[in-house]
Amino acid sequence: MEEFKDQVVVVTGGSRGMGKEIVLAFAERGAHVVIASRKIEACEMLAEEVRLRFGVRALPVACNVSDWDQCGELVDAAYAEFGQVHVLVNNAGLSPHYPSLVDVTEPLFDKTIAVNLRGPFRLAALVGHKMVESGGGSIVNIGSVEAIRPSHMALPYAAAKAGLHVLTEGFAQAYAPTVRVNTIQPGPFLTDIADNWAEGAREELEAVVALGRCAEPAEVVGAVLFFSGSASSYSTGALLRVDGGWR
């Protein structure tokens, strides 16, 4: 519980779902948090909650990670406030629906790639570079089982998450030995994305995982803490499946 005390953790997509649970977990352990998402009001509400509950500092930042410049502004804001970042969690994601593959539009495709791949690239590049200068840190990417078990109804998303695996390997080599970069690959989680699943989708997913159920958002926390701290000191460029035993 003391390992992350007074460390600075940046979480994208941090105001809800898995991101919110990650923020709460680090704040409970004494870390100061930068909560980034598109909607500043939600970030501000969560920031106030963690200040009151855990007595840590919290910086809410409006950031659309698909915007190259906004990624830079997020990093600038974090370092202006805290002077250092110890952990970056690239959690923000987007998996839009479409009626069929032929109906995927260029804007939908580009937006999906931008949120799920371009944003994590830019943030890892900027923060990882600064981590090297300051002596080290950990970058944790949130991927998806879609990267290895793609559905035809989420192909742009799956392709972006597969690209995230490549970024993980590449950044792990680029910023070694002081910065570690790893990816968590969740299976079906009951986040906001699940609210838009088609009728019967949850039952279909639960039928193909060994544990027989979808995960709650907080069930990603253990893996994130593992990759962020000393327990994974010899892990970099690694991929950890948190998918309930996807068959």
Describe the role of every protein-language-model region.
Residues 124, 160, 168:
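Active-site helix of classical SDR
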Residues 129, 172-177, 233:
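Alpha-helical segment proximal to the catalytic Tyr-Lys
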